């Protein structure tokens, strides 16, 4: 309740539920539903660490990231449709140009969606941290939990290049949150 009340939209209805699953995961769904895997709950070493994850997911809801993502997917669909039309027209004279147009359309649409997803994750981190602070939790819980995720190696980190990831690198997220936390006055309610 403290987190919801401190969120950018305290009137937003939120329903939390747990999923019996050992993985470290949480997610937000349309309508304000937020799911948390029991593995993540058990991995949190403090109330503030768990609250940091919930604040992040609340931010996805209050910032309307899901609706924005749906809109972005529609936009990507239009880009794909345009590339298909160009490919059809080009196929009459040169099949290689048609293939290139199709591949470029697919790559452009995918890259746009991945970049947008990373931007939403950064925003959810920032808004979630503000929510955490407003609710009186220890803001150090967010970078602390990110560090644990990084050590566990179970989320976010892989050998995939940054440009194909949906989430920012955990090291970058830790540095960003550490910098933001350093600028905040510590208070815990």
Predicted regions span which residues?
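Active-site recognition of the HExxH zinc-binding catalytic motif
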Residues: 36, 52-60, 64-65, 124
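Short pre-active-site segment immediately N-terminal to the catalytic Zn-binding motif
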Residues: 35-52, 114-119
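Acidic/histidine metal-binding catalytic segments
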Residues: 70-78, 97-100, 136-146
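Membrane-active amphipathic alpha-helices enriched in small hydrophobic residues
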Residues: 77-93, 100-110
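Catalytic zinc-binding patch centered on the HExxH motif and its immediate surroundings
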Residues: 18-32
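Extracytoplasmic and endomembrane cell-envelope/extracellular-matrix remodeling and assembly machinery
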Residues: 16, 108-189
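Catalytic Zn2+-binding segment of zinc metalloproteases
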Residues: 48, 58-75, 93
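A metal-dependent hydrolase signature that marks the N-terminal structural subdomain at the beginning
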Residues: 1-9, 43
